UniProtKB/Swiss-Prot annotation:
Belongs to the TrbL/VirB6 family. Disulfide bonds: none annotated. Component of the type IV secretion system VirB/VirD4 which could be a major virulence determinant for subversion of human endothelial cell (HEC) function. GO terms for cellular component: plasma membrane. This is Type IV secretion system protein VirB6. It is found in: Cell inner membrane. It is a multi-pass membrane protein. The chain crosses the membrane at residues 30-50, 59-79, 142-162, 169-189, 206-226, 231-251. It comes from Bartonella quintana (strain Toulouse) (Rochalimaea quintana). Its main location: membrane. Signal peptide: none annotated. One of its GO terms (biological process) is protein secretion by the type IV secretion system.
C-alpha cells in the first residue's frame, strides 16, 4: 500500500466529474453560440441610441457615463458570447484553479491521490502493522477493534467526499448556465438574477474550498496520531475513532458555514427552512400520536371501570343461591 495505487475516492470522482465536465463544456459552448447574435445586436442598438442621445443633448449624461456603459457592455458581451473567454475567467478559476491552488498550498501529501484516499490508506497500513505485531490470541481483539476503527474512518471519508461531490456537481450546473446569467446583467430588470447567480457560485466555491481545508486539517491530525508509537491497538483506537466522528460532524456543518460566508445562498437557506418545517411536522405528529394514545388509554380505562361497576351491580341483584 505504500505506492497508493488503490484510490477509490479519486476513481469515483473521475467517473462522476469527467462526463459532467464534458456536459458543462457543451452547455457553455451551446449557450454562448445561441445568445451571441441577439446579444450583439442588442448591444449595438443600445450603444448607438445611447450615444446618439448623449451627443445630441437629449439625455443629460456625460461622455464619462457613456464610456462606462460601453465598457460594461463590451465586457459582458465578451464573457457571454465567447466560450473560450468564459472558460478562462470563470470556469477555470472557480472550478479548478482556485480549489487546486488552495489544496496544493495546504496539502503536503507525498502522493497526488485524493486526501480521503490518503487518510484511508494510511489508517489501513497502520492497522496492518499493529495486527502483525500482535500475538496469536490477541489478533482477534485487534482485528475487531481495527475493523471498527477503519469503519469510523470510512464514515468520515464518505461524509467529506459526499459534500465535496455535491459542491462540484452544483458548480458544474451553475457554471454551465453562466453565459445566460451573465447576459442578464445588461438589463436593470434582470440584473438581480445575475447577482443571485454570482452569490450561488461563490457559495459552492467556498464550500469546495472548506472541504479541502477541513480534509487537509483532519488528515494532518489523523496522521499525527497514526505516526505515534503505540504498543497496542487499545491506545490507537480511541483517538482515531473520536477524530473521525468529530470530522464527520464538521463536514455536516460545512454547508451552513459556506452559506454564512457567502452572505447566504438560496439553496441552503431553503434547505434549512424545509428541514425546520419537516421537524415541526414530525414533532406535531408525535404530539398528536401521544395525545391520541392518552385518549385511547383513558377511554379504555373508563370502559373497563364501567364494566366493573356493571359487574358489581349484577352480583348484588342476583343475591345468594
Amino acid at each position: 500500500m505504500s505506492d497508493f495505487s488503490f484510490s477509490p475516492f479519486e476513481s469515483i470522482s473521475g467517473y462522476i466529474l469527467n462526463p459532467l465536465e464534458n456536459a458543462m463544456n457543451t452547455t457553455v459552448s451551446g449557450l454562448s453560440s445561441a445568445i451571441s447574435a441577439p446579444l450583439n445586436l442588442a448591444s449595438i442598438i443600445f450603444i448607438f441610441l445611447y450615444g446618439y442621445n448623449v451627443m445630441t443633448g437629449r439625455v443629460s449624461l456625460s461622455m464619462h457615463s457613456l464610456l462606462n456603459n460601453v465598457v460594461k457592455i463590451v465586457v459582458v458581451t465578451a464573457m457571454a458570447t465567447n466560450a473560450d473567454t468564459f472558460n478562462t475567467y470563470v470556469k477555470d478559476i472557480f472550478f479548478g484553479d482556485l480549489a487546486n491552488a488552495i489544496g496544493n498550498a495546504l496539502n503536503s501529501n507525498p502522493a497526488s491521490a485524493n486526501v480521503f484516499d490518503y487518510i484511508l490508506l494510511k489508517t489501513s497500513a497502520r492497522y496492518q502493522e499493529v495486527l502483525a505485531a500482535a500475538w496469536f490470541l490477541e489478533k482477534i481483539m485487534v482485528g475487531l477493534l481495527g475493523s471498527l476503527m477503519i469503519m469510523a474512518v470510512i464514515v468520515f471519508c464518505i461524509g467529506g467526499f459526499i459534500v465535496q461531490m455535491f459542491a462540484q456537481v452544483a458548480l458544474v450546473m451553475i457554471i454551465g448556465l453562466g453565459p445566460l446569467f451573465i447576459s442578464l446583467y445588461l438589463f436593470n430588470a434582470t440584473r438581480k438574477f445575475t447577482d443571485a447567480w454570482i452569490t450561488t457560485l461563490i457559495n459552492f466555491t467556498i464550500l469546495q474550498v472548506l472541504v479541502i481545508m477541513l480534509g487537509t486539517i483532519m488528515c494532518k491530525i489523523i496522521l499525527h496520531v497514526l505516526n505515534g508509537t503505540y504498543d497496542s491497538i487499545y491506545f490507537l483506537f480511541p483517538p482515531v475513532v473520536v477524530i473521525s466522528i468529530v470530522g464527520a460532524i464538521l463536514f455536516r456543518a460545512l454547508p451552513g458555514i459556506a452559506s454564512a460566508l457567502s452572505s447566504g445562498g438560496p439553496y441552503f437557506n431553503a434547505g434549512i427552512s424545509s428541514g425546520g418545517q419537516i421537524f415541526t411536522m414530525l414533532s406535531s405528529g408525535a404530539k398528536t400520536g401521544r395525545n391520541a394514545a392518552k385518549s385511547a388509554a383513558s377511554t379504555l380505562s373508563g370502559t373497563a371501570g364501567a364494566a366493573a361497576k356493571v359487574a358489581k351491580i349484577g352480583d348484588r341483584g342476583r343475591g345468594r343461591f
